[in-house]
């Protein structure tokens, strides 16, 4: 399990209309490898509104169609639900994710 990997999660929340949702791990790698039972993830949606906090992803990342990572909707998920591996972000996409996370969290360099 690594930062930047995408996983399909069945029934991610009781209020979600879909049976499953793809999430990308955004926690730092040392936390992913730690004894903590959860990691921070960003959901992937088929809607892309072109916001600076959204990262376009698609077939290259293992998805069936064009989608986007929504960095404004971070969630904590148990590592135990991240079992259905979908794909991995390229270094270029990981850099775009980092930029979008900085914008979403108002982190200035």
For the regions a language model picked out, list residue spans one by one.
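Conserved functional hotspots at enzyme active or ligand-binding sites that engage polyanionic ligands
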Residues: 1-109
């Amino acid at each position: 399990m690594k930062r930047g990997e995408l996983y399909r999660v069945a029934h991610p929340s009781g209020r979600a209309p879909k049976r499953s949702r793809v999430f990308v791990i955004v926690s730092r790698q040392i936390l992913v490898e730690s004894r903590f039972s959860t990691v921070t993830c960003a959901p992937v949606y088929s809607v892309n509104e072109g916001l600076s906090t959204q990262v376009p992803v698609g077939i290259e990342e293992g998805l069936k169609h064009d989608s986007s990572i929504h960095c404004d909707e971070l969630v904590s998920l148990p590592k135990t639900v991240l079992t259905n591996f979908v794909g991995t972000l390229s270094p270029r996409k990981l850099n775009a994710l980092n930029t979008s996370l900085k914008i979403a969290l108002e982190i200035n360099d």
